[in-house]
Amino acid sequence: MATLLDIEGTVCSISFVHDILFPYALEKLPQLLKNEQFPIKPGGNQTSDLTPYLESFPEEYKQSAQALEDHVIDLTEKNVKAPYLKALQGYIWKSGYQSGEIKAPLYPDAVDYMKRVVDGGNKVFIYSSGSVPAQKLLFGYSSAGDLTPLISDYFDTVNAGPKMEAASYTTILKAIGFEADRVLFLSDNVREIEAAKKAGLRAYVAERPGNAKLTPQEKEDNVIKTSFEGIEI
């Protein structure tokens, strides 16, 4: 058996991502861009660790530091889950986690659940719109310490696909080698839950403080969990 976990609004609060992580990346970006040579060109003279992340941006935003910064601000404000943005954010967050400026405040019941799953001989997998490197940082530098030994693998929109499409969950099932009915998915997003169900997974909606309010119909159509205490996979 296995459990597949979303992150934002499921194992940690939405406010951590929107109020801590996103602003941190925006604050650090201008100084980082000062060390880059614009326009950014593939195979150019840039040699910094940041350059490969910037090369993934659309051409029109690589002409100047201001254009790129404005684009990042726009995507962040609109919460657009573009893979190239997520990769850049993960790169910037890495220094914050490693310096101790950032520590992911995971819900204690989520941490306990992950430990129970693994102690029971089962597996934990992560599926988030945040990049896989960013996911590893979040669990590696959490309020409960380094939880990466508990996690068997990580999935994002690059290696699995969009979270609201059933095909993405089928891709994950093939990668982890489990039948659909042997995997429990937990997420705060009802559309993700619906997509997972279409792929045959069992799926519960996480209802956490600060999450989007569920409609009466959504509550009727889904299993709702306000805590992971007592959840058995």
Curated annotation (Swiss-Prot):
Gene name for this UniProt entry: UTR4
Enzyme Commission number(s) of this protein: 3.1.3.77
Pathway the protein takes part in: Amino-acid biosynthesis; L-methionine biosynthesis via salvage pathway; L-methionine from S-methyl-5-thio-alpha-D-ribose 1-phosphate: step 3/6; Amino-acid biosynthesis; L-methionine biosynthesis via salvage pathway; L-methionine from S-methyl-5-thio-alpha-D-ribose 1-phosphate: step 4/6
GO cellular component: cytoplasm; nucleus
Function: Bifunctional enzyme that catalyzes the enolization of 2,3-diketo-5-methylthiopentyl-1-phosphate (DK-MTP-1-P) into the intermediate 2-hydroxy-3-keto-5-methylthiopentenyl-1-phosphate (HK-MTPenyl-1-P), which is then dephosphorylated to form the acireductone 1,2-dihydroxy-3-keto-5-methylthiopentene (DHK-MTPene).
Keywords: Amino-acid biosynthesis, Cytoplasm, Hydrolase, Magnesium, Metal-binding, Methionine biosynthesis, Nucleus
Binding site for Mg(2+): 6, 8, 188
UniProt name for this protein: Enolase-phosphatase E1
Main location: cytoplasm
Molecular function GO labels: acireductone synthase activity; magnesium ion binding
InterPro entries per record: Enolase-ppase_E1, ENOPH1_eukaryotes, HAD-like_sf, HAD-SF_hydro_IA, HAD_sf
Entry cofactors: Mg(2+)
Family: Belongs to the HAD-like hydrolase superfamily. MasA/MtnC family.
GO BP annotations, alphabetical order: L-methionine salvage from methylthioadenosine
Subcellular localization: Cytoplasm; Nucleus
Record-listed substrate binding positions: 128-129, 163
